[in-house]
Amino acid sequence: MLNRVKSLLALTVLATFGFASVATADEIVRTGEGRNFYNNISIPAGAETLYLSGSGASPMEDGSWGDMEQQTVNTFSKFKETLESQGWSMEDIVQVRAFAVAGPYGELDFAGFNSGYQQFFGTDKNPMKPVRSFVQIAGLVVEGWLIEIEIRAARMPK
């Protein structure tokens, strides 16, 4: 009798957790929500993924590069255009890696990055937020860039 109860309990636990896994196996799960990003994003097998190489701002009309916020907005705008041209959206972005350098006065403008970033993520238009890394480095390959960003996107097949 005790073995039968143990077997039934084991089957109940397996069925419960098995069904929970099946319920989330077809969706991207975001957990650990913070103000600007999630701590964890789980992408199930079968999801489509897209990786976009590191990119930075384009020079403005006057030839200058702009400050950190302007460069961040410019770079994410370019990503938005690229994603949309391939049938993806900013909501599909699951990871952002940003590499930044100090500006002309030796200060890293993290607030400027966040200000530009917040125009694209966690908004009414795009409530989604990716996981994110922001790393200060010694230099970037393009003189004048303050930021280089790379992204990864994922979505479930339509």
Please tell me what each predicted stretch does.
Residues K6-S77, E81-K158:
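N-terminal presequence-like segments and the immediate start of the first folded domain
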